[in-house]
């Protein structure tokens, strides 16, 4: 399983990577929206994208739309401002408000990754 972490805050990216390390998943990081879209265009699709909405260069909203248009990846929004883009929050597969409880994030991500894996196997 592969997870793309799209987060401009380096400390938050490291924390998310540490959380995911215990879940036996491959991670890729993008510090901004432009890097995230480049990664989506040049790498195999991630199973899950952890997406901050407030990003430099290309907004999280634009990244969200690009993912939905070109990928079947699950999207979990991780943001400090839940009210910033309610239309995207309602379309996401999950939402976590910073700061979040690590154990709750692990439970949700485990569930989403299992469901995504099952969906992908059903399509084969």
Spans of model-derived segments:
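Conserved acidic carboxylate
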Residues: 7, 79
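C-terminal output helix
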Residues: 100-113, 117
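Acidic, metal-coordinating helix/loop segments flanking the phosphotransfer/catalytic sites
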Residues: 29-48
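Two-component/phosphorelay signaling modules centered on CheY-like receiver
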Residues: 10-28
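Alpha4 helix (beta4-alpha4-beta5 surface) of REC/receiver domains from two-component response regulators
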Residues: 62, 80-97, 103
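Active-site residues of response regulator receiver
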Residues: 52
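Short amphipathic alpha-helix used as the core "switch/output" element in two-component signaling
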Residues: 61-72
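Acidic catalytic/metal-coordinating carboxylates
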Residues: 32, 59-62
């Amino acid at each position: 399983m592969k997870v793309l972490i799209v987060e401009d805050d380096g400390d938050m990216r490291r924390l998310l990577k540490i959380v995911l390390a215990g879940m036996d998943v491959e991670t890729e990081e993008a510090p901004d929206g432009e890097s995230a879209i480049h990664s989506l265009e040049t790498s195999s699709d991630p199973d899950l994208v952890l997406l901050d909405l407030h990003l430099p260069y290309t907004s999280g909203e634009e990244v969200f739309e690009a993912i939905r248009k070109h990928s079947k990846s699950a999207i979990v929004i991780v943001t400090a401002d839940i009210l910033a883009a309610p239309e995207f929050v309602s379309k996401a597969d999950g939402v976590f408000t910073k700061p979040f409880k690590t154990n709750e994030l692990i439970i949700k991500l485990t569930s989403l990754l299992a469901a995504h894996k099952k969906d992908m196997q059903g399509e084969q």
